[in-house]
Each structure stands twice: as structure tokens, then as C-alpha cells.
Amino acid sequence: MKRVTILAILLTALVACQNSTPTPLAPITTATETEFTLGPGQSAAIVDAVFTIRLIGVTNDERCPAEIECVVSGPVTFTITLQKAPGEPVEYTLQSFTDHDGRSPDGPFEGIQDRIEYEGYVIRVKGVLPYPLKSMDEVKDWEYRVSFIVTKK
């Protein structure tokens, strides 16, 4: 009976560890013309542009896994909010193609919104990591990191 109880406790602890959510990422401060990276729920105050960008999360990842041959590789889609104090946050959905290193191309693609204009600035996606290796659903939501750059329009 004692062994069964110990086994049950260990099994419960193992399941709890696997289902735990990571600690939220701390907000960062950055400036225009500087690439920065956010995780889901994390925000960056763009000091010289006087607004905040928050990555809500990746909503869809259709990139072809690196170890699989695909006919087509799709974009990764994610949601951000932009907020200029004291206003309300405005939500945007962006998409980007990436190479296997997770870097986004510099040029725009027709039908893909990888940049937006906001308050006289351009917010552009620079990369999305990690890149899936074996399956499209192997990356956990909290593992994603999206890199941006903010430039004056």
C-alpha cells in the first residue's frame, strides 16, 4: 500500500510539472531602429516612439517543418497590441514567412501583412522562432519568440 501511495504522488507530481505554464516574461524597454524579441504576453515600451507593443501570441503556424518535404510552406500568424498612453490597446494580426533560421524576408509578400503603420512608425516582423522541425504542432504556444523592429515612417 505504501508503494502505491508513493507511486501515485510521484505520478501526480510528474503530470503537474508537464502541465505547468511558464513564468510570464518581464516587460522590456527598447528604442526605434533596434531589433527586439518578445514572447507571448510580453511587452516592449518603445521609448522614443512613446508606445508599447505586446505580443499576444502565435495563433497559427503553417511553416513546413525542416525535416519534412512539403509542396507548400505557409506563414506563421500572430496577434499583437499597440498602445499609446493613455489610449486603449489596438489589436493587429500579422503574418510572416520565414526561412529555416526563423528570419523573415525584408521585402513584402502580396496578401501577407508582416508590417503595420502606427502613429508615424512602421512595425515590422524580423523573425519567428523556433522553427518547427518534425511536425507543425510540436512547438508549444509559450515557446514562440517573435522579433520586431520599429522605424520612423
What do these predicted regions represent?
Residues Q18-S20:
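Bacterial signal peptide processing site
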Residues P22-T32:
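Short, low-complexity, disordered segments immediately C-terminal to signal peptides
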